[in-house]
């Protein structure tokens, strides 16, 4: 099992995973993460698969990215956390919340179009 790359800012028992948008990376949120960590959070700037310094794979769907986040949390032994998702990361975060709401304290969605897509859109990079 491959684990997503991340940079951590702050040192707290409260965790916030920041999930970037399409073609982005966790470091895009570094200045915000520094301010958030001042509010007693460890902020995880996560690079989704096929982005930043995370692994690359031909499988690239929202469902698989949700499982990548779950694997990341389990690997780091984080039982409860909050999610902030931007754009594509917002879609991934909402799907994560549908499947694993018991793991979440909060969910914050930034700048997405709330639309249900047809099934042929599920595989992002055909």
Go through the PLM ranges and name each one.
Residues 1-8:
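A short loop-to-beta-strand scaffold at the N-terminal edge of the catalytic core in hydrolase folds
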Residues 94-98, 105-126:
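Flexible "cap/lid" loop of the alpha/beta hydrolase fold
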Residues 39, 100-103:
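Conserved dinucleotide-binding and phosphotransfer motif residues
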Residues 42-84:
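Active-site loop/oxyanion-hole signature of alpha/beta-hydrolase fold enzymes
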Residues 8-55:
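Conserved HGGG/HGGXW glycine-rich cap/lid loop of the alpha/beta-hydrolase fold
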Residues 85-89, 93:
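Gly/Ala-rich beta-loop-alpha elbow adjacent to hydrolase catalytic centers
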Residues 11-13, 77-80, 101-102:
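Active-site acidic short loop of glycosyltransferases
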Residues 33, 73, 96-97:
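A conserved amphipathic alpha-helix that caps or lines the catalytic cleft of carbohydrate-
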